From Swiss-Prot:
Enzyme class: hydrolase
Record key words, sorted: Cytoplasm, Hydrolase, Nucleotide metabolism
Catalytic reaction list: dTTP + H2O = dTMP + diphosphate + H(+); UTP + H2O = UMP + diphosphate + H(+)
Entry's family note: Belongs to the Maf family. YhdE subfamily.
Protein's UniProt keywords contain RNA-binding: no
UniProt cross-references to NCBIfam families, sorted A to Z: maf (TIGR00172), PRK00078.1 (NF000867)
Protein name: dTTP/UTP pyrophosphatase
UniProt-annotated location(s): Cytoplasm
Stated role: Nucleoside triphosphate pyrophosphatase that hydrolyzes dTTP and UTP. May have a dual role in cell division arrest and in preventing the incorporation of modified nucleotides into cellular nucleic acids.
Pfam family, one: Maf
Keyword rRNA-binding: no
A GO term for molecular function: dTTP diphosphatase activity
Active site: 73 (proton acceptor)
Length: 194
């Protein structure tokens, strides 16, 4: 069995990966996301970020044998504009106000790197999410929980913001941060059967 390494500090990703893998390591990536600027193609962008994270972690590994590194990046897009993590509460408010009553997309890029052979595969998942109309008070109350500040698009579907979601079309786990079905098929492609 190959040693699986998750290149992420995200507790949500770690929890999701534990659902399908009993044994894996966590090595946090120090990849500088600003070194991969957005150039108008969201799927390519999230896959490039995921690959950058996986490659960054692969350089930290001493034992090069039998290691697969999983990199992942998730972002929210609205009107073809990327919404990352909010800079401050004002930014979070503006993001949630824009998403209110509208449909947006959540993209996750995945990369799996075989450290020994340097073989890498990348893919992405897109999920459409529709928010109900939110009041300013609802948005402010949610932001004051602190839950919005470390999440793309300023919300976490698995938490209190779940009540904002009118409907979802696609992979729920993608919106949480790790599309398990796509990850499973990619791991199988790399010779790992769960």
């Amino acid at each position: 069995m190959k040693n699986i390494i998750l290149a992420s500090a995200s507790e949500r990703r770690q929890e999701l990966l534990k659902r399908i893998l009993e044994d894996f390591q966590i090595i946090v990536s120090d990849f500088d996301e600003s070194s991969a600027p957005f150039k108008d193609n969201i799927p390519s962008y999230v896959m490039n970020l995921a690959e950058g994270k996986a490659r960054s972690v692969s350089k930290k590994i001493m034992d090069q044998d039998s290691n697969l590194v999983i990199g992942c990046d998730t972002l929210v897009a609205f009107n073809n504009k990327v919404l990352g993590k909010p800079k401050d509460k004002k930014d979070a408010f503006e993001m949630l106000q824009a998403l209110s009553g509208n449909e947006h997309e959540v993209y996750s890029g995945l990369a799996i790197l075989d450290v020994k052979s340097n073989k890498i595969i990348t893919d992405f998942v897109c999920t459409k999410v529709k928010f109900s109309k939110l009041t300013s008070l609802q948005i402010e109350k949610y932001i004051n929980t602190g839950d919005s500040m470390d999440k793309a698009g300023a919300y976490g579907i698995q938490g209190k913001a779940g009540v904002f979601v009118e409907n979802i079309n696609g992979c729920y786990y993608n919106v949480v941060g790790l599309p398990l079905n796509k990850l499973n098929s990619m791991l199988m492609e790399m010779g790992v059967n769960l």
